[in-house]
Amino acid sequence: MLSQHEYGAEKSRDFEAMRAGTAMDRRAGPPVEIRPSPSLRLGDKAPDFTQDSTQGPIHLYEWMGDSWAVLFSHPSDFTPVCTTELGMVARLKPEFDKRNVKAIGLSVDPLSYHDMWARDIAETQGVELNFPLLADADRKVAVLYDMIHPNAHATETVRSVFIIDPNKTVRLLHTYPASTGRNFDEVLRVIDSLQLTDDLQVATPVNWNLGDDVVILTSVRNQEADKLFPQGYKELKPYLRITPQPSR
């Protein structure tokens, strides 16, 4: 394992080499052929896997148990946007816990880099890394989840996020440009919507947040709606009926 000083010197050399357009892959080994995998879609079964992490080997399905999961990838360790993202996820752990959600991050960097980067995150973001970070150095998970574009640099995952429910079904997938950090409040908002609408015959309208009014599904007839929503509802159109958010 590199010391902090040795790693800093190595990264400095790498940065200068990249600026000159001659950077070598910092991970040893022959070039890896990235073969496109079938793209995941909403409603697909989330691929299971076993991979090393900062909290030991992770077998996804066993690790999740009956929980929801947020799996998110980042392009590289020791990068500014990713550092702020991981700090935010760590700070939001009580919110994830409240919703029975486990967060797990991923990059194709080795475990030794993750361990060193965790110290930087604690120093700069003021919070310890309190969730596992997958060391997907063999790109196994990245390929399963289509996180590496076949025409992109094979050593960097795209900035993706997946919400997986307790049935191991993909409920959301979203990919951001490398320059844009994710909004994890929005991730929580989507989880709130999914957990609410899984149990009730409602959908959540534009810019909805927990506690706001919801809309009644068009499949529910008015006679049934009268029983299901005792707080009443406002019918703006036969297909647009607004009701206070019911309790689950």
Locate predicted features.
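Chalcogenol-based redox active-site neighborhoods
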Residues: 2-248
